[in-house]
Amino acid sequence: MGRLHCTQDPVPEAVRGDMQQLNQLGAQQFSDLTEVLFHFLTEPKEVERFLAQLSEFATSNQISLGPLKSIMKSLLLVPNGALKKGLTAEQVRTDLQTLGLSEEKATYFSEKWKQNASTLAQWAMGQTLMVNQLIDMEWRFGVTSGSSELEKVGSIFLQLKLVVKKGKQTENLYMELTLPQFYSFLHEMERVRASMECLS
């Protein structure tokens, strides 16, 4: 198997078999399945709808749901990697063919990729920016009163509590900084704020 653009990791052997299964689908079946996959890629939080659509596809095409899920997992390998690495439609097509998908189906998929590229890129960018949104920050100054190192006694430190939003949940992160580290951190935060104001 040639090198893939979407991942450096070794690809499970089952992926090749899944691609062969995809090759056996008719053009309309592959088109319908691709439609389901792109719905999921553009709205990945809709897992239940995705599974319902897969189940419906399996029933209407007399395919077992278990193998179909495996096929979709293998097919998702390329677009997921492509989103992370910003691959072109041509690179997506090449990767699918390298994994064993027929040229006709790989070309069809890459055309769909091209049509949805801007929506997918915006979603991926939004995810990247929203992953660790800082909601609140608290800090307290302290003075070291006892330490095994004599020169550290009397030194000022700072305890930070960051409230970070990860998806729909918030998480508290704690850290302790020396005064020079804190001023360096503050300086970086000011630079980030200035950059954000320039962009808005």
From Swiss-Prot:
Assembly, per entry: Component of the commander complex consisting of the CCC subcomplex and the retriever subcomplex. Component of the CCC (COMMD/CCDC22/CCDC93) subcomplex consisting of COMMD1, COMMD2, COMMD3, COMMD4, COMMD5, COMMD6, COMMD7, COMMD8, COMMD9, COMMD10, CCDC22 and CCDC93; within the complex forms a heterodimer with COMMD9. Interacts with RELA. Interacts with CCDC22, CCDC93, SCNN1B, CUL7.
Organism encoding this protein: Mus musculus
Superkingdom as given in the UniProt entry: Eukaryota
Claim: Cell inner membrane is one of the keywords in the record: no
PROSITE patterns on file: COMM (PS51269)
Main location, first listed in the record: cytoplasm
Its job: Scaffold protein in the commander complex that is essential for endosomal recycling of transmembrane cargos; the commander complex is composed of the CCC subcomplex and the retriever subcomplex. May modulate activity of cullin-RING E3 ubiquitin ligase (CRL) complexes. Associates with the NF-kappa-B complex and suppresses its transcriptional activity.
Family affiliation: Belongs to the COMM domain-containing protein 7 family.
Cellular component, GO, one term: cytoplasmic vesicle
Entry keyword set: Cytoplasmic vesicle, Transcription, Transcription regulation, Ubl conjugation pathway
PANTHER family, alphabetized: COMM DOMAIN-CONTAINING PROTEIN 4-8 FAMILY MEMBER, COMM DOMAIN-CONTAINING PROTEIN 7
COMM domain ranges (all copies): 133-200
Record-linked Pfam families: COMM_domain, COMM_HN
MF terms (GO), sorted A to Z: NF-kappaB binding
One GO term of the biological process aspect: tumor necrosis factor-mediated signaling pathway
Protein name: COMM domain-containing protein 7
Localization of this protein: Cytoplasmic vesicle
